[in-house]
């Protein structure tokens, strides 16, 4: 297993448009839409206008409801929702694209989102922003951003150990990597869960794996964060097929946030074990 459709998006994109694609992703929360808009527009002004015309807001489950206290209950999907998507590092420019920031930007009105992105990340002057967007209360827009999770750090050994525990389907070991207030969510399922105990009960109840070897985790690079394409063994033919794409937020306390994306368009049709 050596990649996914997620990485194919980077391969199909013009590398000279990396900055514009990253800008459009920060506006839209979708790598697919970002590539489309960047291909059709030569300037940041034109691309920003099209992003505003699309006026999409892509949420995560944490934006729609409170945490669930029933990790063993039935999971409900909302496939009609346009969910936030991860972003391949191969497309990223030098500015921030971490998922917590993108999710926070998606909660803002689109014009305020554009103003914050253009000023803080693209270094546009207030006059240039006003010429494009009209008057915007930039300090007020910036103040509306929710506080982000604890400071992210690079912990490759933790990510590797987490991968090994998942491939062994060792749930107690998996849970040792999560911070006490960790969040687990998995669009398009609307429920989300807080704390290692609930996360463990969720995995034990709903994960199709039965033992070691049922899951294979392929490391990816997404949103400048550790990520894994998870392939699950199909017991009918022993082929590992696309199951979910996990993006992790790591802090000194451990994994503070895990998002498991079940959008299978991010994967090839199947992978042989």
PLM features: residue spans?
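A short, charge-rich alpha-helical start-of-domain segment used by transcription regulators
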Residues: 1-22, 30-35
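C-terminal and inter-domain tail/linker signature
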Residues: 7, 11, 29, 63-75, ...
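Σ70-family region 2.3-2.4 aromatic/basic alpha-helix that recognizes the −10 promoter
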Residues: 17, 39-73
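Short, small-hydrophobic-rich alpha-helical interface motif
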Residues: 20, 24, 34-47, 129, ...
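Short alpha-helical functional segments enriched in proximate histidine and acidic residues
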Residues: 23, 27, 50, 54, ...
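Acidic active-site catalytic centers that drive phospho-/nucleotidyl reactions
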Residues: 33-36, 53, 120, 170
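Active-site micro-motifs of SAM-dependent methyltransferase domains
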Residues: 49, 53, 123, 184
């Amino acid at each position: 297993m050596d990649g996914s459709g997620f990485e194919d998006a980077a391969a199909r994109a013009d590398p000279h448009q990396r900055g514009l694609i990253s800008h459009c992703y920060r506006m839209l929360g979708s790598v697919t839409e970002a590539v489309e808009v960047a291909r059709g527009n030569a300037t940041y002004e034109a691309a920003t206008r099209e992003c505003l015309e699309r006026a999409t807001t892509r949420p995560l489950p944490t934006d729609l409801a409170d945490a669930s206290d029933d990790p063993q209950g039935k999971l409900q999907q909302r496939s009609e929702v346009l969910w936030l998507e991860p972003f391949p590092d191969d497309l990223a420019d030098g500015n921030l694209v971490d998922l917590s920031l993108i999710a926070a930007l998606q909660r803002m009105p689109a014009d305020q989102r554009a103003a914050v992105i253009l000023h803080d990340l693209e270094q546009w002057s207030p006059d240039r922003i006003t010429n494009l967007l009209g008057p915007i209360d930039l300090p007020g827009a910036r103040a509306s951003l929710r506080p982000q999770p604890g400071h992210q750090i690079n912990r490759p050994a933790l990510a590797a150990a987490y991968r090994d525990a998942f491939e062994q389907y060792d749930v107690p070991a998996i849970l040792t990597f999560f911070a006490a207030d960790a969040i687990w969510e998995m669009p398009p399922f609307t429920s989300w869960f807080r704390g290692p105990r609930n996360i463990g009960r969720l995995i034990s109840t709903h994960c199709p794996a039965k033992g070691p070897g049922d899951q294979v985790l392929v490391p990816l690079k997404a949103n400048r964060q550790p990520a894994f394409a998870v392939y699950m063994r199909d017991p009918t033919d022993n082929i590992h097929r696309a199951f979910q794409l996990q993006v992790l937020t790591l802090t000194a306390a451990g994994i503070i946030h895990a998002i498991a994306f079940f959008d299978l368009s991010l994967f090839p049709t199947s992978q042989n074990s």
